[in-house]
Amino acid sequence: MARKALIEKWNKTPKHSTRAYTRCRICGRPHAVLKKYGICRICFRELAYKGEIPGCKKASW
């Protein structure tokens, strides 16, 4: 239940725009969020390995 309450809280627009911050759309993690995709690095890595992010592949050099 606490998770549902937090999700509802994040979806509301804040009173002042400076209070808004990025959170992962999948797990809700507040840190290490990639703005381009809107997800955290951990979720990004999982989705990239599954091939669910188009145009993304593992780097090797």
Curated annotation (Swiss-Prot):
Its cofactor is Zn(2+). The gene is rpsZ. Keywords: Metal-binding, Ribonucleoprotein, Ribosomal protein, RNA-binding, rRNA-binding, Zinc. Zn(2+) binds at residues 24, 27, 40, 43. This is Small ribosomal subunit protein uS14. Binds 16S rRNA, required for the assembly of 30S particles and may also be responsible for determining the conformation of the 16S rRNA at the A site. It holds the Pfam family Ribosomal_S14. Binds 1 zinc ion per subunit. GO terms for cellular component: cytoplasm; small ribosomal subunit. Part of the 30S ribosomal subunit. Contacts proteins S3 and S10. GO terms for molecular function: rRNA binding; structural constituent of ribosome; zinc ion binding. Belongs to the universal ribosomal protein uS14 family. Zinc-binding uS14 subfamily. GO terms for biological process: translation. HAMAP family: Ribosomal_uS14_2_B.
